[in-house]
Structures are given as C-alpha cells and as structure tokens.
Swiss-Prot record:
Protein name: Flagellar assembly factor FliW
Family from the record: Belongs to the FliW family.
GO biological process: bacterial-type flagellum assembly; regulation of translation
Pfam family, one: FliW
PANTHER family from the UniProt entry: FLAGELLAR ASSEMBLY FACTOR FLIW
GO cellular component terms given for this protein: cytoplasm
Species of provenance: Leptospira interrogans serogroup Icterohaemorrhagiae serovar Lai (strain 56601)
Subcellular location(s) of the protein: Cytoplasm
HAMAP family in the cross-refs: FliW
Length: 150
C-alpha cells in the first residue's frame, strides 16, 4: 500500500512504506525532521532524492559514494554503528549528499565526510561524521571519478 507525500522535485506522489526511512536524530543541521522518503529520479539515473515527509521544501540529492570513489571507507567507531543496529558499514545502504551548483553542474560536490548510513532491514538511518581525514565536505565528484578511471 502506498503513502502519498508532497515532494519538492516531483510534486505529489505515491511512495511505498519501504521507501520511508526513519532518522531518530534527524540529519546534521535538520535534527527536527525524522522521516524521509528515498525517491529514485528515473530508473537509469544514479541520483536519488532524500525527501522529508514532514517539510516539502527539505529534499537532498544523494548518491552512493562508490559511484565516484570505489575505495570509499568512512571511519566510524563500531559503537556508533550499533546505534542504528549494524556492526559494519557494509551492512548498510551508504549515501552521500550532493550539492549541484546551478551555474555549473560539472562542479557538483559530495559530502564524503558526512555519510548517511541506513540499516537495510529496519530502515533506520543516521548521518555520521567520518573520522577519515581524506574525506571532505565538498569533494568534487567528476574530478574524483576521473582520477579513479584514469
């Protein structure tokens, strides 16, 4: 059975209950918003939307970091992972928030320092702070992908 939500990018739409994620602590800077829908833009698109079900104007573009950084390994203490019911990062769906500048989409960046990990079974997620010093709040996606490919 679907749930109707209002979204910033697509207007009103139906989502399944399995698309609704709980963030008991909210996201960094948006702690008051606890429920988000994970919405695919288009089947062939790598981008997804993390849309607040509580505030229509709150939506983030997200992607799996492995798409542009194959060896992405956030450094997060195991004790923190237990907070969402996982023991290892590989047990989660890992996403990073993308910022796309309107004037030049080729300069889009990803917050690899603040990964969002989601327990695939319980659909409970949290935005963590990676202790890996090579991770950045604004990692250039196309540059990182080019370095990995070339």
């Amino acid at each position: 059975m679907g749930i109707e939500i209002q979204t910033k990018p697509f207007g009103k739409m139906q989502v399944s209950e399995r698309q609704i994620l709980s963030f008991p602590e909210g996201l960094l800077g948006f702690e008051e918003y606890k429920k988000f829908a994970l919405i695919e833009e288009e089947e062939e698109s790598v981008f997804k939307w993390l849309q607040s079900t509580e505030e229509v104007d709150l939506a983030f573009v997200v992607i799996p970091p492995s798409l542009f950084k194959k060896e992405y390994k956030p450094l997060i203490p195991e004790q923190e992972l237990l907070g969402i019911g996982i023991n290892e990062i590989k047990e989660s769906l890992t996403l990073v928030i993308v910022t796309v500048p309107g004037e030049d989409p080729s300069m889009m960046t990803a917050n690899t320092q603040g990964p969002i990990l989601i327990n695939k079974e319980t659909l409970i997620g949290k935005q963590f702070i990676s202790r890996n010093e090579s991770h950045s709040v604004r990692e250039k996606i196309l540059e990182s992908a080019a370095v990995e490919i070339g």
